[in-house]
Regions:
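Substrate-binding/catalytic subdomain of NAD(P)-dependent oxidoreductase enzymes
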Residues: 1-76, 82
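Catalytic, metal-anchored helix/loop core of enzyme active sites in primary metabolism
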Residues: 42, 52-56, 60-126
């Protein structure tokens, strides 16, 4: 709701994928809790929905989390415990991955996976 969880995930991805050394304080965060009733009505009137989107544009040094109005059919509009990520590639264009991202089992699995990745990275000297 406040965007902190999404910002933390953005920091982890940025440091892992682009070998950056960013901190949570480097992310501009606007939580979905800051939305007004007018913004919610506007999205509804346009047959859209509002989702909290974490965005990284490394070549511009942009790291931000903010609510966005998206068409209900947009690939990032997922429900319940699903998370989605869209990666903009040079050769294939946009690629969207969707999977479970919330809940106690999913969180535990992700933590274990992250710890194994970190262990393997240190073992290789990365």
């Amino acid at each position: 709701v406040k965007g902190i969880d999404a910002a933390i995930k953005l920091v982890i991805l940025s440091n892992t994928i682009w070998k950056r050394n960013v901190k949570l304080s480097d992310v501009t965060i606007t939580g979905i809790d800051m939305l007004t009733n007018d913004a919610l009505r506007l999205a509804e009137d346009q047959h859209c929905t509002i989702r909290l989107i974490a965005e990284a544009i490394p070549e511009k040094g942009i790291l931000r989390v903010a609510p966005r109005i998206l068409p209900r059919t947009h690939p990032l509009v997922v429900e319940n415990t699903l998370n989605a990520i869209t990666i903009d590639t040079d050769m294939a264009g946009e690629i969207t991955l969707i999977g479970k991202g919330a809940g106690s089992r999913e969180t535990a699995s992700a933590c274990i996976g992250d710890l194994l990745f970190i262990k393997d990275s240190h073992a290789r000297g990365n």
